[in-house]
């Protein structure tokens, strides 16, 4: 009997994190949340969920799959009653891809129902989980997010806010949360502000979202970013801000600008698209090469390639065409089929590549498998030279703050020098933007090792938040990413 399993046709990029969306006080809350999640689909494709509240009762639907599949049934949408809603798109960084891990999670407390969606990773979740189990907690999922609910249940404070604050003071890691309770919606960012969260307004309604592109799709006006370490409460009287977690050095994830965020979003008052163009221009200044055409690896490489071409004077061309309708493919995953998998997503445009010296621009190299196939594809299309330029520094370290990265030993840049990597992928030359060049593109003079303005741990190994579970040699990989020898 033939068993078919899904494989990812693009397994050589860092995987997106999760998406958050919430709206308070709108008659079409569920429908608008679906639209917001559509705009944020790039941040998580494994599962999607929505929880609504009509003031007293909560309604929920969660399922594995894309937003369009999960919420396609009009009859289902009519069951999601209420004027407030929160939604979540999931790409798992902790816990299996099963329905019980799909967010927003929902629990009943003595004060009423409470739903929560999480983007990020709690780096002491396994330690806390073990402590809570010893105290009698019964966990229903394998995601780190559930830890917050049990900490709230154990909290001594009486109000919802008291319990949330007491719970979050015990967790470590990178997180943005959007929560829904009776009569209120809550947004929180961790003290280092690693993961994004923005606040918007639609008429008399307030909106929370991971990115501004989700505000745009529903016509909401951007108000501001939720600040690092800030907790906002949205209720019938408006938006209230508190800062209960003390101060910490802000370290927003720089990879949001390189790859994760949608290019039409603005994060921390910066245009993502313009940041990528500037990165490409800086890359051209640092690593120019004689060539006939600059070609992006679509879609993530396009803005950087435009910036590279403009700075270098080498013409830009769409030498690789992407098929946007292919992702995980359910066919027999033989080696031959896997080798063809990249062609399901990318195909060389031989009409503009033949006889050309080509500069390929991509955002990153993780394992090197996709880069190898794309270089080969471009050569087969008739390119006489292939030079690879990467709009991020070499990824030498794993991320423990909400990005699904391979263990360190599987990262190509951890194992090889740049020259060895060029040989591995079959390129005539390979260059990455320097870490100082990346910071220059972001408006800084250089990276200040004593006080970096971003989290760049995947490049530098400088982790701004404790890796408690990893450091204690955690041995249950299904519960946490905090150890590097997981299967």
Residue ranges of each PLM-predicted region?
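Flexible loop/turn segments at secondary-structure boundaries
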Residues: 28-30, 93-94, 124, 194-195, ...
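Active-site proximal loops enriched in glycine and acidic residues that flank catalytic Cys/His/Asp
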Residues: 179, 189, 210, 236, ...
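Phosphate/diphosphate-binding loops
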Residues: 166, 214, 221-222, 226-230, ...
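Amphipathic alpha-helical
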Residues: 147-159, 298, 310-328
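Short, glycine/charge-rich flexible loops or terminal/linker lids adjacent to PRPP-binding catalytic cores
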Residues: 313-358, 369, 396-406
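PRPP-dependent phosphoribosyltransferase catalytic core
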Residues: 168, 183-184, 201, 219-225, ...
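A conserved beta-strand->alpha-helix junction
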Residues: 141, 146, 316-327, 424-442
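Conserved short alpha-helical segments that host acidic/polar catalytic motifs at enzyme active sites
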Residues: 1-228, 233-291, 297, 385, ...
